[in-house]
From Swiss-Prot:
Described function: NDH-1 shuttles electrons from NADH, via FMN and iron-sulfur (Fe-S) centers, to quinones in the respiratory chain. The immediate electron acceptor for the enzyme in this species is believed to be a menaquinone. Couples the redox reaction to proton translocation (for every two electrons transferred, four hydrogen ions are translocated across the cytoplasmic membrane), and thus conserves the redox energy in a proton gradient.
InterPro entries in the cross-refs: NAD(P)H_OxRDtase_bac/plastid, NADH_UbQ/plastoQ_OxRdtase_su3, NDAH_ubi_oxred_su3_sf
Name of one Pfam family that matches: Oxidored_q4
UniProt cross-references to HAMAP family, sorted A to Z: NDH1_NuoA (MF_01394)
Designated name of the protein: NADH-quinone oxidoreductase subunit A
Family: Belongs to the complex I subunit 3 family.
Keyword line: Cell inner membrane, Cell membrane, Membrane, NAD, Quinone, Translocase, Transmembrane, Transmembrane helix, Transport
EC number(s) recorded for this UniProt protein: 7.1.1.-
Entry superkingdom: Bacteria
Length: 142
C-alpha cells in the first residue's frame, strides 16, 4: 500500500512541477515582453503574403475519415506495444486476445474499404436513364 502511495506521489509531484514550469514560463514571458499591438502585428500571417479570402474553409469529409482511421490504428499500436514487451510471459491466451483485437480492427478497415471510404477519387454513379413513356389518351380514365 505504501509503495502505491509513493508511486502516486511521484506522479503527482511530476505533474505539479510540469504545471508550475508551464504557468511560470507563460507568466514570465507575459510580464517581460513589450506589448505594443498595431494593425500589422494583429493581421493574419500566411507565409509573408497578404491573406486572401476567409480562413474558414470547408474541408472535404474524406480528410476526416482518413484521420479517424489513422487515429484508430495509432491507438491500436499504443495498446500492442506494452503487450509485445511482455509477450513471452503472457502465453498463448494473450496471443489469442491480441489477434482478436487486431482482427476486429482489420474487419473495420475492410468495411471502410468496401464502403469506399478509402477511395480518394470516387467514381460518379452511372445511373441509367429510363425511357419516357407517352400516355395513350384512349386508356386515360376521366
Amino acid at each position: 500500500m505504501d509503495q502505491t502511495l509513493s508511486d502516486f506521489g511521484t506522479v503527482f509531484v511530476f505533474l505539479l512541477l510540469g504545471i508550475i514550469f508551464v504557468v511560470g514560463g507563460y507568466l514570465t514571458a507575459r510580464l517581460l515582453r513589450p506589448s505594443r499591438p498595431n494593425p500589422e502585428k494583429l493581421a493574419i500571417y500566411e507565409c509573408g503574403e497578404e491573406a486572401v479570402g476567409s480562413a474558414w474553409v470547408k474541408f472535404n469529409i474524406r480528410f476526416y475519415v482518413v484521420a479517424l482511421i489513422f487515429i484508430i490504428f495509432d491507438v491500436e499500436v499504443v495498446f500492442l506495444f506494452p503487450w509485445a514487451t511482455v509477450f513471452k510471459q503472457l502465453g498463448e491466451f494473450a496471443l489469442i486476445e491480441a489477434l482478436v483485437f487486431a482482427g476486429i480492427l482489420v474487419i473495420g478497415l475492410v468495411y471502410a474499404w468496401v464502403k469506399g471510404d478509402l477511395d480518394w477519387v470516387r467514381p460518379t454513379p452511372n445511373i441509367p436513364k429510363m425511357p419516357v413513356l407517352e400516355e395513350d389518351e384512349s386508356q386515360v380514365v376521366s
